Curated annotation (Swiss-Prot):
TM annotation in the entry: none
Annotated compartments: Secreted
Domain comment, as recorded: The cysteine framework is IX (C-C-C-C-C-C).
Protein name as it appears in the record: Turripeptide Pal9a
Length: 34
């Protein structure tokens, strides 16, 4: 998805994606819920 992996320091992602903590990258990133 277009927003997968986006940084979201403000907690906001583009449409359809959710901001959550990425353990591997140790930062908040956007992901598209499966």
């Amino acid at each position: 998805n277009v927003c997968d992996g986006d940084a979201c320091p403000d907690g906001v992602c583009r449409s359809g994606c959710t901001c959550d903590f990425n353990v591997a990258q140790r930062k908040d990133t956007c992901f598209y819920p499966q």
